[in-house]
Amino acid sequence: MVFEGFLTGEGLRVAIVAARFNELITSKLVGGANDAFRRHGVAADAVDTAWVPGAFEIPLVAEKLAKSGNYDAVITLGAVIRGATSHYDYVCNEVAKGVAGASRETGVPIIFGVLTTDSIEQAVERAGTKAGNKGYEAAVSAIEMANLLRTI
């Protein structure tokens, strides 16, 4: 037997958790995600967005939304840009672990769409210029995973 998730969003309820820190970038990611949801048939009123202060706060809110039972999938969006200290490494590792753990614990797909880049230029590229929009990609993954889990 082959299990596959289809890219149709009709009937899905989804949540976006987005970090306000680096909002110049994250607002573009959220826009890309909403565009993907719309293009794949997710109703506009079936998409809720929670803004958190920074990337470190994403896992807690994503887990709470997933546990609510109101959503078929949650996507997480943020931009962590390397600086002169080791803060970047701690934040990236903890956010990634937190999101993965919350998804496993709740059984709800929580998609990691947090950019981890070495420069602001790389982040801008991934938020809708040269390298596409990672928010859009995260939304498409959420649709596919929500549908896949319905078939298993």
UniProtKB/Swiss-Prot annotation:
The keyword Ubl conjugation does not apply. SUPFAM superfamilies: Lumazine synthase. One of its GO terms (cellular component) is cytosol. GO terms for biological process: riboflavin biosynthetic process. Keywords: Riboflavin biosynthesis, Transferase. 5-amino-6-(D-ribitylamino)uracil binds at F21, A55, F56, E57, A79, V80, I81, F112. Its EC number is 2.5.1.78. (2S)-2-hydroxy-3-oxobutyl phosphate binds at A84, T85, R126. Gene3D superfamilies: Lumazine/riboflavin synthase (3.40.50.960). GO terms for molecular function: 6,7-dimethyl-8-ribityllumazine synthase activity. It catalyses: (2S)-2-hydroxy-3-oxobutyl phosphate + 5-amino-6-(D-ribitylamino)uracil = 6,7-dimethyl-8-(1-D-ribityl)lumazine + phosphate + 2 H2O + H(+). The active site is at H87 (proton donor). InterPro entries: LS, LS/RS, LS/RS_sf. Pathway: Cofactor biosynthesis; riboflavin biosynthesis; riboflavin from 2-hydroxy-3-oxobutyl phosphate and 5-amino-6-(D-ribitylamino)uracil: step 1/2. PANTHER family: 6,7-DIMETHYL-8-RIBITYLLUMAZINE SYNTHASE (PTHR21058:SF0), 6,7-DIMETHYL-8-RIBITYLLUMAZINE SYNTHASE DMRL SYNTHASE LUMAZINE SYNTHASE (PTHR21058). NCBIfam families: lumazine-synth (TIGR00114), PRK00061.1-4 (NF000812). Forms an icosahedral capsid composed of 60 subunits, arranged as a dodecamer of pentamers. Catalyzes the formation of 6,7-dimethyl-8-ribityllumazine by condensation of 5-amino-6-(D-ribitylamino)uracil with 3,4-dihydroxy-2-butanone 4-phosphate. This is the penultimate step in the biosynthesis of riboflavin. Belongs to the DMRL synthase family. This is 6,7-dimethyl-8-ribityllumazine synthase.
